[in-house]
Amino acid sequence: MRNFILFPMMAVVLLSGCQQNRPTTLSPAVSGQAQLEQLASVAAGARYLKNKCNRSDLPADEAINRAAINVGKKRGWANIDANLLSQRSAQLYQQLQQDSTPEATKCSQFNRQLAPFIDSLRDNK
């Protein structure tokens, strides 16, 4: 049951996290922990795509993490700790592997939800 709930929650984080354009008007600040969680979720999803969904076009984990940090910087999140991001992303990746959602569903959802992030990975190559 826990795993069945984990995937939809990760999907919501991925959808709402780094895929939105930064608004031009002032918005409430996002806590450092929420920033880390959003970026780590995106990195974990990309890593899952690479390792479990046959996306050999995706770069090494370190490059994915750097790209996630760059996304954060573009959003004005300058204080993301690379080591914490790597650790949290690895934890989330392990949770995704243990999630009972069918792999085809996870791959399809992540491919769709992470398309803008994956495009940014290609642009940075």
UniProtKB/Swiss-Prot annotation:
List localization entries.
Answer: Cell outer membrane
Question: Which PROSITE patterns does the UniProt entry name for this protein?
Answer: PROKAR_LIPOPROTEIN
Sorted alphabetically, the keyword list is: Cell outer membrane, Lipoprotein, Membrane, Palmitate, Protein transport, Signal, Transport
User: Which range is the signal sequence, renumbered to this chain?
Assistant: 1-17
Classification via Gene3D superfamilies: Chaperone lipoprotein PulS/OutS
> What is one Gene Ontology biological process annotated in the Swiss-Prot or TrEMBL record?
intracellular protein transport
Role description = Involved in the secretion of pullulanase.
UniProt key word Lyase: no
What family does the database annotate?
To E.chrysanthemi OutS.
Superkingdom assignment: Bacteria
Which InterPro entries is this protein grouped with?
Chap_lipoprot_PulS/OutS, Chap_lipoprot_PulS/OutS-like, PulS/OutS-like_sf
Report how it sits in the membrane: Lipid-anchor
Name the residues where the record annotates lipidation as N-palmitoyl cysteine.
18
What residues show lipidation of type S-diacylglycerol cysteine? Answer: 18
Q: Say yes or no: keyword Lipoprotein present.
A: yes
The protein's name is Pullulanase secretion protein PulS
Short name of any one Pfam family annotated for the protein: T2SS_PulS_OutS
